Amino acid sequence: MKKYQVIIQDILTGIEEHRFKRGEKLPSIRQLSEQYHCSKDTVQKAMLELKYQNKIYAVEKSGYYILEDRDFQDHTVELNPADFQELPYEDFRICLNESLIGRENYLFNYYHQQEGLAELISSVQSLLMDYHVYTKKDQLVITAGSQQALYILTQMETLAGKTEILIENPTYSRMIELIRHQGIPYQTIERDLDGIDLEELESIFQTGKIKFFYTIPRLHNPLGSTYDIATKTAIVKLAKQYDVYIIEDDYLADFDSSHSLPLHYLDTDNRVIYIKSFTPTLFPALRIGAISLPNQLRDSFIKHKSLIDYDTNLIMQKALSLYIDNGMFARNTQHLHHIYHAQWNKIKDCLEKYALNIPYRISKGSVTFQLSKGILSPSIQHMFEKCYYFSGQKADFLQIFFEQDFADKLGQFVRYLNV
């Protein structure tokens, strides 16, 4: 047997015997050449063959990693954020190709399981623990993105007499459209950079009309703010007291380097519905989301889901499961943290030059300013065509996105305020 074949056989045996785990990094080319007393070219030939067999995958300037082991049961490992490349497309493509090997019987044929692929549910359950979301597998449902989950929730009834949905103002624009286009009765509660008025929240809950309170507690878009722990605790307490379900949309959780606690963590009475989206972290075409439901809502949710589709794309579900379990998702998330932190520092540096005396929050790729009513005149709105404006009852807001001309836009904004 030739030397490169010996290397291949040893690594395959290691995978069979679980000595090499999913996501584990192999020894370097240099280390293997010394171990097997051969040239680096010989080792490289072995690596290329293993890569062709979809047993390993390469990370630029890092090395080779095990794509999948035999029992599919191992957990994600800690990896250096510098290992990951610019975008997850290539790694996800590898997982997509691997998901098609030897699984035709249940991926290409009919697989009726509305709650989602069992492997992905297991992967998501483990992943959510990183966000302090502790849920059981039988509470999880895989959906075709968070938008489908929100649509289904708006169709559901909870308790007799409760017909309205409470949303924050401002909030996720697609949620507003979803409610309005269906003619669903709703109320709003003002939110600014400091949070919401808890007394007003209790007053609205007391009406007995609210079935769901839709909120983005962490890295709110467009405000960029996060509820403090006291506010989160109070919201959960009020939801229990007035029998209201909370829809917690945590779609930017992967960008929260502070790892703040979600409402779901504080909930001990099954009042919080937790929604996790993978689109912001990976790419828009991946329309897969996950929702953790209180037991009393799960059956109703699945019945409504069955009216929309038979099941969420099984091949993409399997690919995402592989992507999570072999460590690729963890590396991509860490890489995004690195990019986000670099953006945050650049925005912060620009802001510190002007010593602004107005409230603001830095969020994912933007900064949002809270301004007194009336400052956002038509002239400034024309000046910043690519910025986002929104008006509240007590304040106006301007969101400037981080682009190449961010410093120039910020300078124009400061000059406008000083006129």
Each predicted region: which residue ranges?
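General small-molecule cofactor/ligand-binding pocket signal
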Residues: 141, 185-189, 273, 359, ...
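Proline-centered loop/turn at the N-terminus of a beta-strand
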Residues: 164, 211, 243-245, 271-273, ...
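N-terminal basic, amphipathic alpha-helical segments
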Residues: 1-112, 122-125, 306-313, 317, ...
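Conserved core of the PLP fold type I
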Residues: 107-242, 254-266
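Short, polar loop motifs at secondary-structure junctions
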Residues: 170-173, 386-390
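Active-site PLP attachment segment
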Residues: 59-61, 267-300
